Amino acid sequence: MINEYLKLMKPHVIWLLVLSALVGYIAAAGPLVNPIKLIELTVVGFLSTGGSAAFNMYYERDIDSLMVRTMKRPIPSGKVTPLNALTFSIAVSLSGFTLSYLWLGSWVTLMIALGWFFYAVLYTIMLKRRTWLNIVIGGFAGNAALLSGWIMAKPIDLESILLSMVIYVWIPAHIWSLAYYARDDYKRVNVPMLPTMVNEKASVRIISILNLVSIIYMLVLYQLYMAKLIGYILVIPATLAGIIVTIKALIKPSNESFRTMFKATSPILLLFLLAVIISRI
């Protein structure tokens, strides 16, 4: 049963957001990183992002039960009741906010709460079922994750904003490549996503271009602010792999090629974030 509640928190999704917050802190603090603060930020990040994910599961239980990709989730499968899921999401979220305020201060808590709002309220409730721009607007939750870590050590500045934009620029290609191969699911429940709103040829071009933009943006940003050989050992292979996967999907589009692109986007972002860490500590 405990495992089902953990699934509500989407650990396979939120770990990148938690890592983004840690990267924000490490990038700002450099060699002065406090290991205790890293642990506290990890706990707070897991609770707050997990709480918003659990709320998303609760709110979308109706469409999750109709989509092949999601019908085995805890609520549609009957393993967790909607009321218990809602109660769990509220309890976990409030725990995250409270610990954030006690451990990390009001500004960090404000940024974390802003990220929660963008995902749980703005994206999940207000936008997802109304416009294909849902992830474009709701994607600012990713910025908030990284910035919440940054302001633990420094005020927000141009570098922090540009660094947080890595997450924002990465999100559309990540989500829409999934939506491309799962477009029948999204059509079934009338959720507007780019691949369900434009023709297939346009979808392929837009998603591929956005993925290339995301990859190149990471490389350029690393060159501008980090530019250390040890980091390039991670960034350059990630860049090349991302370009190859994207070109293959562009030349020969299929559900499988876009599934491959989707699966590649997370490791590419991970390698960039790890490069930032090893370049700053």
From Swiss-Prot:
User: Does the UniProt entry include the keyword Lipid metabolism?
Assistant: no
Name the catalysed reactions: heme b + (2E,6E)-farnesyl diphosphate + H2O = Fe(II)-heme o + diphosphate
Q: What is its EC number?
A: 2.5.1.141
Which molecular function terms from Gene Ontology are attached?
protoheme IX farnesyltransferase activity
Q: Which Gene3D superfamilies match?
A: UbiA prenyltransferase (1.10.357.140)
This protein's UniProt keywords: Cell membrane, Heme biosynthesis, Membrane, Transferase, Transmembrane, Transmembrane helix
* GO cellular component: a single term: plasma membrane
What are the GO BP annotations of this UniProt entry?
heme O biosynthetic process
Could you tell me where this protein is found in the cell?
Cell membrane
Indicate where this protein is primarily found.
membrane
- Asked whether the keyword Transmembrane helix is assigned, the reply is yes
Membrane topology of this protein = Multi-pass membrane protein
In terms of InterPro entries, this protein maps to: Protohaem_IX_farnesylTrfase (IPR006369), UbiA_prenyltransferase (IPR000537), UbiA_prenylTrfase_CS (IPR030470), UbiA_sf (IPR044878)
Transmembrane portions of the chain: 13-33, 38-58, 85-105, 107-127, 132-152, 161-181, 206-226, 227-247, 261-281
Family annotation (CDD domains): PT_UbiA_Cox10
Pathway linked to the protein: Porphyrin-containing compound metabolism; heme O biosynthesis; heme O from protoheme: step 1/1
Listed PROSITE patterns? UBIA
| Family named by the database record | Belongs to the UbiA prenyltransferase family. Protoheme IX farnesyltransferase subfamily.
Instruction: State the protein's purpose.
Output: Converts heme B (protoheme IX) to heme O by substitution of the vinyl group on carbon 2 of heme B porphyrin ring with a hydroxyethyl farnesyl side group.
What other facts are recorded? Carbon 2 of the heme B porphyrin ring is defined according to the Fischer nomenclature.
Protein name (record): Protoheme IX farnesyltransferase
Name the source organism: Caldivirga maquilingensis (strain ATCC 700844 / DSM 13496 / JCM 10307 / IC-167)
